[in-house]
């Protein structure tokens, strides 16, 4: 996807206090609800992006013994929650989003069609439905459109995703595949021990980046620039 140095550059502290009241879009990704689920919020101020994220891991995932990344460290950092249930309920995600809605303006939630099928009712309960046009059902063609932008954002160090290294791990586990027409898609390097859910949640959110309203704080009030 990008060079290691670019991922290290993205692993910086985010001042979440400065983002309060700001516009953002959400991305959600998972392969199986008895494995990993990730949700995140993408902000854009000028050219700089910020990605606030959280991971839920099923304690009964069959892949845990294969994973070398120190998940317990991410839990201590507050970036990850172990779920002591056989499945990760969609409500874990929507409760997290509902809490973030008290702090930020979430314009849209992006996830792919198959994942939305499971999340649909829980998202509806917090006000997000395709009918309201605040849910984006991401297709491969949408990802192809933003892949070049994602590459640019990494190469120019235009994204910060906090001090936890888990996003670095997710992204390093993904690879960019280019077809004969030059279209880019993302694939897993190894599906069981090297998870990509966090990166793909960010990719989903990036497909809705144009929904983020640019705002500035003036005398403790927010004004929309465009």
Segments the model singles out, each with a brief description of its role:
Residues 1, 32-37, 47-49, 59-63, ...:
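Flexible loop/turn segments at secondary-structure boundaries
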Residues 42-108:
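Nucleic-acid-processing active sites and adjacent nucleic-acid-binding tracks
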């Amino acid at each position: 996807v990008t060079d290691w140095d670019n991922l290290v550059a993205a692993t910086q502290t985010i001042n979440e206090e400065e983002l309060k009241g700001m516009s953002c879009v959400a991305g959600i990704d998972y392969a199986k609800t008895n494995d990993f689920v990730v949700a995140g919020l993408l902000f854009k101020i000028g050219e700089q992006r910020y990605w606030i994220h959280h991971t839920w891991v099923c304690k009964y995932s069959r892949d845990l013994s294969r994973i070398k990344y120190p998940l317990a460290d991410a839990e201590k950092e507050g970036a990850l929650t172990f779920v002591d249930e056989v499945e990760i309920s969609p409500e874990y995600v929507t409760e997290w989003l509902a809490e973030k809605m008290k702090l930020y303006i979430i314009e849209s939630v992006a996830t792919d069609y198959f994942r939305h099928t499971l999340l649909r009712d829980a998202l509806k309960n917090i006000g997000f439905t395709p009918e309201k046009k605040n849910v984006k059902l991401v297709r491969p063609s949408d990802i192809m459109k933003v892949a070049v932008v994602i590459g640019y954002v990494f190469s120019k160090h235009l994204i910060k995703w906090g001090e936890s290294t888990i996003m670095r791990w997710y992204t390093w586990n993904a690879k960019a595949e280019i077809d004969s027409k030059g279209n880019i898609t993302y694939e897993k390097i190894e599906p069981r021990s090297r998870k990509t859910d966090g990166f793909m949640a960010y990719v989903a959110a990036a497909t809705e980046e144009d929904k983020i309203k640019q705002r500035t704080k003036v005398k403790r009030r927010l004004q929309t620039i465009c």
